[in-house]
């Protein structure tokens, strides 16, 4: 695949800036690495926030919009966003009805979102609930399903929770439908080659075809 990068170290920031310039009717970037809805509803509704490392487009920023997510915090490629950035994403999504945090089952994301949730609860009195996406059946056995990663299946959670929030449902109602969706979603992915990190410039691993 051909790709054009100005400087690999600027890949994430330039990608997000380009996204907002190309679709300024949908996206807004109030600060670096934070994408929110450009035209939020005036009515009070439950906010929905996600976040994670870059390199998985259109996740996460591509699902910010009406009936979907209200904000997404973005880290470096394959790296969790900071807890401070996640807290700012929660604040940006808050409409006074609480905020659902819906993201993948990764250690760094869990740690930072937990800290962000505690911060906004203490400093801003924002109530948050959390639903983890654990749809990737290739990453753990059924007996250890709680260890499974969240990948493409979380998109269904974004849509179901986002639609419920848009209807004016409570935080508990939005959380329940997101949890039910994730509990009933399974995915598996495959790739023909290993990935290439922009800052490295070559494949992370080389595999011999069987």
Protein language model annotation of sequence segments:
Residues 1-48, 202-204:
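N-terminal amphipathic/basic leader segments beginning at the initiator methionine
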Residues 2, 46-53, 69-72, 98-107, ...:
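Short glycine-rich or small-residue beta-strand-to-loop segments that form or flank ligand, phosphate
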Residues 17-28, 69, 73-74, 91, ...:
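Generic secondary-structure signature for well-ordered alpha-helical cores
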Residues 131-184:
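Short alpha-helices
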Residues 56, 65-96:
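Glycine-rich oxoanion-binding loops at beta->alpha junctions
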Residues 205-210:
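Conserved small/polar residues in nucleotide/adenosyl-binding loops
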Residues 32-66, 73:
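Glycine-rich, flexible N-terminal cofactor/catalytic loop recognition
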Residues 110-124, 144:
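Short Gly/Thr/Asp-enriched flexible loops that form oxyanion-binding sites at enzyme active sites
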């Amino acid at each position: 695949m051909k790709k054009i990068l100005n400087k690999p170290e600027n890949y994430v920031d330039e990608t997000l800036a380009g996204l907002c310039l190309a679709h300024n009717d949908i996206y807004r970037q109030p600060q670096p690495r934070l994408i929110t809805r450009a035209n939020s509803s005036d009515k009070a509704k439950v906010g929905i926030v996600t976040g994670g490392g870059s390199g998985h487009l259109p996740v996460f920023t591509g699902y910010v919009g009406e009936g979907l997510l209200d904000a997404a915090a973005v880290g470096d490629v394959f790296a969790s966003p900071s807890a401070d950035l996640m807290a700012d994403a929660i604040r940006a999504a808050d409409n006074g009805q609480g905020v659902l945090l819906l993201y993948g089952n990764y250690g760094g994301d869990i740690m930072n979102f937990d800290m962000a949730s505690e911060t906004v609860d203490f400093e801003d009195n924002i109530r948050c609930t959390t639903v983890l996406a654990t749809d990737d059946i290739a990453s753990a056995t059924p007996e250890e399903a709680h260890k499974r990663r969240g990948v493409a299946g979380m998109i269904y959670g974004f849509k179901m929770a986002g639609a419920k929030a848009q209807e004016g449902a409570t935080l508990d109602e939005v959380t329940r439908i997101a949890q039910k969706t994730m509990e009933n979603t399974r995915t598996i992915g495959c790739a023909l080659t290993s990935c290439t990190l922009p800052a490295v410039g070559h494949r992370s691993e080389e595999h011999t075809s069987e």
